[in-house]
Structure formats: structure tokens, C-alpha cells
């Protein structure tokens, strides 16, 4: 088993002070969690393998991403930084990488224009392009026989629908089919968030995480629902994810990154300590 990565995620929304990290349940009812640069430094010191910054209001409000927050963070933190939110063009990618990010995460723009993935990965390299896929369970399997039907933990059947604009708009796209297309187009990684689990503390959505991990060759970062180190463990063992992303458990001080890594190491999951 390859070394598993633990990645704190900072959902950032812009305010007068130049960025506030927020975390809500299913992207609504957002609670403030602190200054993004301070939190990034804290996670760096705790041994995070990477950081993800998502400007969660950017796509929705059509605002360009917060370059200054990226620059300040990149000056303080020396682990890989992925930035997403409102990235719609090659020029956006260029600006964010120039500001100090190592990778960009594309989501809504990739669904609207899949060739954007190919274009960006051709210019900057696949290793720089992470495609974020937000999905929701859809229990209407009767009328969706062309979709990838999976069995949920309770035996119910469902397919996973790709949603965009921060989870607000369903697309009709099947998550497994879309993920395969994204890989073909040149994305180097997939950041998979189940909206059914986001912020719930119920653990990762294992059926879809496992399916993508088995079907694709590129790394899958599991996201949405981590409440304790055991959830991270299940994401790696049952979900076969390459990396685990979490927000709430780190932001509100319930666990440090080191706590999670030590718990994983005690269960023989290879992590960098």
C-alpha cells in the first residue's frame, strides 16, 4: 500500500479582512473557522501532506479567486497547495499557479466545457490539474438504466449524479462515467465529494469512493463526512482512496492532523509522520 495523504481542506469565502475559512453542513449554514493563512500554517506544523483551498463562493458569484490569500499562504507554507473555485480559463490557472499554488482544482467549468481539462493539462501538465467532482445519490434507478447503479450500505440501489455550482445544480451526469472522461482528458487527480456526507461526521461515502478507486488509474482524494480517524481508515481500506480530505474535524480542534496520522499508523496504514 502506498503512503496515504491527509489533506485539510479550507473552504474560504472572501470578506473585508481578505478571506475567512468557513465550514458548513452540505455547503449551507456556514460557520466561521478562522483566518486561512493562520490555519494553513497550523496544519503545515501538524504534518499535513497537502492543503486544499476552495473559494466556495467564487463560481456562484462569478468572482475571480483570491490571489492575495494564495500568495500569503505560499510564503508561509511549504507543502503542496491546491486551489479551486471560480477557475474558468487557462489564464485563471496561470494566475493561481503563479501566485504560488502547486495545483488547481476545476469543477463547474470542467462540466460546462470538458475540453478545458485537456487544454489546461496540455499547457501546465496533468500533475497540476485536479478535477473536483461533487456528487449526490439519486435513488431513481428505474429511469436511469444507462447510469452506473451501485448498492448502498443499506442495500438500496442508487446512482451518483454530478452536481455543480457548490452542489446547487444537478447535471444529469453519472459520476463514474464523468470521472472516466476526466481521466481521459488529462486530469491528474480527482477530488470526490459526496454531498450526502459533506459536513455530517458520518464518514466517507464508501460505495462511490470504492467504485472510482477501482475503475480509475489516477489518484482519488475522498472528501465529505470525516468525523474521526476511523472514518479516514475506512476511506483507505474500504474505499481504497489514495488520500483523505477533511475540514471540520481539524478546524474546530477536535483532532490534529498528527492525531489522525498516529491513529492510522497504529492500524498499519502507511502515513508520513
UniProtKB/Swiss-Prot annotation:
InterPro entries: Aldolase_TIM (IPR013785), His_biosynth (IPR006062), HisF (IPR004651), IGPS_HisA/HisF (IPR050064), RibuloseP-bd_barrel (IPR011060). Keywords: Amino-acid biosynthesis, Cytoplasm, Histidine biosynthesis, Lyase. Pathway: Amino-acid biosynthesis; L-histidine biosynthesis; L-histidine from 5-phospho-alpha-D-ribose 1-diphosphate: step 5/9. It catalyses: 5-[(5-phospho-1-deoxy-D-ribulos-1-ylimino)methylamino]-1-(5-phospho-beta-D-ribosyl)imidazole-4-carboxamide + L-glutamine = D-erythro-1-(imidazol-4-yl)glycerol 3-phosphate + 5-amino-1-(5-phospho-beta-D-ribosyl)imidazole-4-carboxamide + L-glutamate + H(+). GO terms for cellular component: cytoplasm. GO terms for molecular function: imidazoleglycerol-phosphate synthase activity; lyase activity. It holds the Pfam family His_biosynth. The active site is at residues 11, 134. It is found in: Cytoplasm. GO terms for biological process: L-histidine biosynthetic process. Its EC number is 4.3.2.10. SUPFAM superfamilies: Ribulose-phoshate binding barrel. IGPS catalyzes the conversion of PRFAR and glutamine to IGP, AICAR and glutamate. The HisF subunit catalyzes the cyclization activity that produces IGP and AICAR from PRFAR using the ammonia provided by the HisH subunit. HAMAP family: HisF. Belongs to the HisA/HisF family. NCBIfam families: hisF (TIGR00735). Heterodimer of HisH and HisF. This is Imidazole glycerol phosphate synthase subunit HisF. It comes from Methanococcoides burtonii (strain DSM 6242 / NBRC 107633 / OCM 468 / ACE-M).
Amino acid at each position: 500500500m502506498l503512503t496515504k495523504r491527509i489533506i485539510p481542506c479550507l473552504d474560504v469565502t472572501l470578506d473585508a479582512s481578505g478571506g475567512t475559512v468557513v465550514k458548513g453542513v452540505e455547503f449551507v449554514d456556514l460557520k466561521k473557522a478562522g483566518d486561512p493563512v493562520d490555519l494553513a500554517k497550523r496544519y503545515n506544523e501538524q504534518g499535513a501532506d497537502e492543503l486544499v483551498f476552495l473559494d466556495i463562493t467564487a463560481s456562484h458569484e462569478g468572482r475571480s479567486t483570491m490571489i492575495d490569500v494564495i500568495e500569503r499562504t505560499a510564503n508561509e507554507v511549504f507543502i503542496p497547495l491546491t486551489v479551486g473555485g471560480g477557475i474558468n480559463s487557462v489564464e485563471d490557472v496561470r494566475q493561481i499557479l503563479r501566485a504560488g499554488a502547486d495545483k488547481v482544482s476545476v469543477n463547474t467549468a470542467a462540466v460546462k466545457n470538458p475540453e478545458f481539462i485537456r487544454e489546461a493539462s496540455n499547457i501546465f501538465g496533468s500533475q497540476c490539474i485536479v478535477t473536483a467532482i461533487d456528487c449526490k445519490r439519486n435513488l431513481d434507478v428505474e429511469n436511469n438504466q444507462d447510469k452506473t447503479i451501485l448498492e448502498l450500505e443499506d442495500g438500496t440501489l442508487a446512482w451518483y449524479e454530478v452536481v455543480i455550482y457548490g452542489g446547487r445544480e444537478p447535471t444529469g451526469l453519472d459520476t463514474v462515467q464523468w470521472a472516466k472522461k476526466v481521466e481521459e482528458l488529462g486530469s491528474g487527480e480527482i477530488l470526490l465529494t459526496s454531498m450526502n456526507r459533506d459536513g455530517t461526521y458520518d464518514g466517507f461515502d464508501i460505495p462511490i469512493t470504492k467504485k472510482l478507486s477501482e475503475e480509475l488509474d489516477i489518484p482519488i482524494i475522498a472528501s465529505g463526512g470525516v468525523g474521526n480517524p476511523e472514518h479516514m481508515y475506512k476511506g483507505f481500506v474500504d474505499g481504497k482512496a489514495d488520500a483523505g480530505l477533511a475540514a471540520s474535524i481539524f478546524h474546530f480542534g477536535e483532532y490534529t492532523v498528527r492525531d489522525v496520522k498516529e491513529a492510522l499508523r497504529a492500524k498499519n496504514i502507511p502515513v508520513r509522520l
